């Protein structure tokens, strides 16, 4: 394969999802043998977040084409392992590179409930991607990735200052919140903070620690019930998230 370059436009065109994954694996293995592949694609299955240094984004802005690529190292130490594990757990996160805007959230409850309520309010946008980061601790890694590729975003996180938390937990929560706020680029992103999490926003009251089992199911069950009244504060935040 020495000195061989493969140019392939939209390989996903005639492939089903399973074939796309197999094709991507074959291309990846071929590069180890010396083949250089240049692939243009609109499929997230041909992208691995962990290989962000090999990505190049072409974006049309008015009458011009802007190109974004990042060859440096965004992560160090344990961050590399954690970030790669996040991708392996949920490879759908690669779709963030195709989004007009990315909505970063902590977990499943946020993703499920925000999607439902945004559709209920008529503000949901299919060109936006809601990316579940796995935890608040992982959000900074995604922010750095989005900043590097100039992708617009909003970070949605929990304040986590519940009355039942001890002093150490409150200090850790505050530190994580400030870290997120400092990383958000003024030109690309913004942040929305839940008080203290989306469950308290939904129920409009403080929640006991024991009430946090099976969160996604019970949260969605609550908001889809007939007669549920969406708190005005939460409504405003959802509208801001999807603006």
Pin down the residues of each PLM region.
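Switch/communication elements of ASCE P-loop NTPase nucleotide-binding domains
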Residues: 1-92
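Acidic, Mg2+-coordinating catalytic modules of nucleic-acid enzymes
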Residues: 90-104, 108-243
């Amino acid at each position: 394969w020495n000195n061989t370059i493969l140019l392939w436009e939209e390989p996903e065109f005639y492939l089903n999802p399973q074939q796309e994954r197999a094709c991507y694996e074959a291309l990846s293995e071929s590069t180890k043998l010396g083949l250089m592949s240049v692939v243009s694609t609109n499929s997230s299955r041909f992208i691995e977040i962990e290989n962000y240094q090999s990505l190049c984004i072409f974006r049309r802005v008015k009458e011009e084409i802007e190109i974004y690529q990042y060859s440096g190292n965004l992560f160090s130490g344990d961050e590399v392992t954690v970030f790669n594990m996040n991708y392996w757990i949920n490879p759908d996160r690669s779709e963030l590179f195709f989004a007009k805007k990315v909505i970063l959230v902590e977990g499943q409850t946020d993703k499920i409930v925000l999607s439902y309520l945004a559709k209920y309010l008529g503000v949901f946008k299919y060109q936006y991607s809601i990316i579940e980061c796995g935890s608040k601790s992982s959000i900074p890694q995604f922010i750095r990735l989005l900043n590097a590729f100039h992708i617009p975003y909003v970070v949605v996180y929990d304040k986590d200052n519940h009355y039942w938390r001890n002093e150490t937990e409150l200090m850790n929560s505050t530190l994580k919140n400030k870290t997120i706020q400092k990383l958000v680029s003024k030109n690309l992103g913004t942040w929305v903070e839940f008080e203290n999490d989306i469950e308290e926003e939904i129920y409009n009251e403080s929640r006991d620690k024991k009430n946090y089992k099976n969160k996604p199911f019970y949260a969605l069950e609550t908001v889809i019930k007939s007669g549920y009244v969406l708190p005005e504060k939460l409504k405003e935040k959802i509208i801001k998230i999807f603006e």
